[in-house]
Amino acid sequence: MNIKQCNLLFALHARMIPVKCNFKNSYSDLTCPVCNDSNHQDSQLHILQCKTLLNGENILVKKQISYNDIYSCDVTKQSTVVQLFENLLSKRRRIENERKTAE
């Protein structure tokens, strides 16, 4: 893993990535801003499950990835889940920016 990925892994461990559930006191509505489904809270786990981010694909099953891999002692598992988070967070930022631009 590179330094950027190590920093992301630390942020995931410490629940510091920018999702509403990590900063509950700052938000009255914890709904995912990407899928806007009131049944899904904006959490780290939901990022790996959000149908809008995944485009309907079940990447977790395909790559045999688990959210708990961020806490694993297996560096390969950690690296795989961090790379997936990197891609999904990047896609999330892109979607949020496109929506802001469209407003």
Residue ranges: model-predicted function:
Residues 1-103:
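Family-specific functional microsites
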